[in-house]
């Protein structure tokens, strides 16, 4: 299975709206609005975590256009875990609850590869088309 994840956050009428989506090349698996004020980074983390949880027991390739979510999972999360999710000054890191949830969710699928894809690309590739559908659905969900 291949899942494309996306999060969206923007200001409309003075209020920050947010949503996320999980899609395959053919269908929308989930598209949800998120609480007002949710940042784009948090929306992306939530989408990636939900994709992992949805893939419990399956083999899955997950694509994200978020460097923040991708690098959180691949490079930063284990370091933050070792530091008990604290910054160098001892303050809790941003989004620590969702990052902890992400670190648990990574073990849900039987096999998983999480890959970064370029956002807003129109090169006709499967990754570009999946990302475009995810982006559209995440923006709709935010409204």
Model-derived regions, located:
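RNase H catalytic domain
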Residues: 7-15, 27-28, 32, 48-132
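Short glycine-rich loop/turn motifs
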Residues: 16-22
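A short, polar/acidic, helix/strand-boundary loop motif
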Residues: 24-44
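Short, intrinsically disordered/low-complexity patches at protein termini
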Residues: 36, 54, 137-138
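An amphipathic alpha-helix/helix-turn recognition signal
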Residues: 38, 42, 46, 129, ...
């Amino acid at each position: 299975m291949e899942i494309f994840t996306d999060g969206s956050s923007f200001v409309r009428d003075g209020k920050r709206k947010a949503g996320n989506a999980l899609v395959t090349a053919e269908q929308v698996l989930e598209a949800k609005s998120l609480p007002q004020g949710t940042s784009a980074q948090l929306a992306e983390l939530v989408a990636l975590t939900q994709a992992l949880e949805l893939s419990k027991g399956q083999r899955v390739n997950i694509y994200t256009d978020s460097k923040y979510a991708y690098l959180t999972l691949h490079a930063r999360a284990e370091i933050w875990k070792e530091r008990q999710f604290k910054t160098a000054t001892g303050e809790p890191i941003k989004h620590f609850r969702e990052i902890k949830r992400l670190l648990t969710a990574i073990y849900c699928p039987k096999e998983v590869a999480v890959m970064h894809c370029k956002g807003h690309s129109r090169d006709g590739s499967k990754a570009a088309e999946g990302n475009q559908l995810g982006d559209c659905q995440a923006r709709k969900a935010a409204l």
